[in-house]
Amino acid sequence: MGQKINPLGFRLGATQGHHSLWFAQPKNYSEDLQEDQKIRDCIKNYIKKNMKIFSSVEGIACIEIQKRIDLIQVIIYMGFPKLLIEHQKIEELQMNIQKELNSVNRKLNMAITRIANPYGHPNILAEFIAGQLKNRVSFRKAMKKAIELTEQAGTKGIQIQIAGRIDGKEIARVEWIREGRVPLQTIKAKIDYCSYTVRTIYGALGIKIWIFVDE
């Protein structure tokens, strides 16, 4: 039976790049890795806390961290960056992260990049499906709506999988749907992937999304 490898790790160096770009001494490596996780968690928690009530999608596609001796550069790729830009929240977020890291001799720089087609990115799409499932929308309806949104974003194919106690059924099961082509075996095919856990009143559901972006 074929083993299912993570599509992003499988394509590293071919069509995928790293989201953390820095070098460290072996003895400091784990500390730097934990620091990266702290930064990512801090950003996600801040946006979740300050999110508008009506928007169920945070819209973070990915967070890129670049480090030098005296500088930490953080680039947040967002689908809907209004929240941070309009209310000057980015300075507040920057101060929060600086407090969390407690690094005096390093400057922290933050930038926000807007994504052209937010629903062409699996993380944002997974958040959309999670919001639908939390509002007790039928999983098939949520999947079909998600596929419509990605088609508008101009992708070549998509596969969505939801696993768990779907619709509150006693027995957990896996449901999936595919539209277009999703060549997982081809390394040169640019495939975006994400796995996301959503907590519903019936328990946790796992959402996995593969999007075929380009050859």
UniProtKB/Swiss-Prot annotation:
Domain KH type-2 residues, every copy: 43-116
CDD domains: KH-II_30S_S3
PROSITE patterns: RIBOSOMAL_S3 (PS00548)
Stored InterPro entries: KH_dom-like_a/b, KH_sf_prok-type, Ribosomal_S3_C_sf, Ribosomal_uS3_bac-typ, Ribosomal_uS3_C, Ribosomal_uS3_CS
GO MF term set: rRNA binding; structural constituent of ribosome
Primary subcellular site in the record, as a coarse category: plastid
GO biological process: translation
Keywords assigned by UniProt, alphabetized: Chloroplast, Plastid, Ribonucleoprotein, Ribosomal protein, RNA-binding, rRNA-binding
GO cellular component, one term: cytosolic small ribosomal subunit
Subcellular location: Plastid, Chloroplast
Pfam families: Ribosomal_S3_C (PF00189)
UniProt record similarity statement: Belongs to the universal ribosomal protein uS3 family.
Quaternary structure, from the entry: Part of the 30S ribosomal subunit.
Protein's UniProt name: Small ribosomal subunit protein uS3c
Protein source organism: Morus indica (Mulberry)
